[in-house]
Curated annotation (Swiss-Prot):
InterPro entries the UniProt entry points to: Cyt_trans-like (IPR004821), PPAT (IPR001980), Rossmann-like_a/b/a_fold (IPR014729)
Keywords carried by this UniProt record: ATP-binding, Coenzyme A biosynthesis, Cytoplasm, Magnesium, Nucleotide-binding, Nucleotidyltransferase, Transferase
Function statement: Reversibly transfers an adenylyl group from ATP to 4'-phosphopantetheine, yielding dephospho-CoA (dPCoA) and pyrophosphate.
Natural source organism: Corynebacterium diphtheriae (strain ATCC 700971 / NCTC 13129 / Biotype gravis)
Subunit structure, interactors included: Homohexamer.
Name this polypeptide is given: Phosphopantetheine adenylyltransferase
GO molecular function: ATP binding; pantetheine-phosphate adenylyltransferase activity
Length: 159
């Protein structure tokens, strides 16, 4: 069985994320969407448990996708779970420059390969950070987020 992981903070999960997850699910027998702690990002709008619930709801139509969370080294998770590849979406060359050293380190530490998928152009401008910012100022990002996430982000901003 070929297994892949799609790691990220997913705060919140966007349509761009779902596109990458869906494309990974077409190429692998099992895909784990892994909510990870990123020390370079603030604590986030949504708790880890909220993110897990929103991702589970948003990916329920994918029969070979599961959702988990992890706070340690990604390669420790891949090794412990027999995962063959890490799948990451790239929007721009800046994403590549950020992701490449991590991919090389993961390869060196555990021999796990990283598969880069180019973002579908219709999602290339979407980021979780941008969606949160636009929502805080009253903008509508509902077409950039899964329905449950669009509702949840509006509720978060109201509270």
């Amino acid at each position: 069985m070929r297994k892949a992981v799609c790691p990220g903070s997913f705060d919140p999960v966007t349509m761009g994320h779902l596109d990458i997850i869906g494309r990974a699910a077409q190429q692998y027998d099992e895909v784990t969407v892994l909510v990870t702690a990123n020390p370079n990002k603030p604590s986030g709008m949504f708790t880890v448990d909220e993110r897990l619930a929103l991702i589970k709801e948003s990916t329920a139509h994918f029969v070979n996708v599961k959702v988990d969370n992890w706070a340690g080294l990604l390669v420790d998770y891949t090794t412990a779970n027999g995962i063959d590849a890490i799948v990451k979406g790239l929007r721009t060359a800046l994403d590549y420059e950020y992701e490449l050293p991590m991919a090389q380190m993961n390869r060196k530490l555990a021999g796990v390969d990283t598969l880069f998928l180019m973002t579908d152009p219709q999602y290339g401008y979407i980021s979780s950070t941008l969606c949160k910012e636009v929502t805080k100022y009253g903008g509508d990002v509902s077409d950039m987020l899964p329905p449950a996430v669009a509702a949840a982000i509006v509720e978060k901003v109201k509270s």
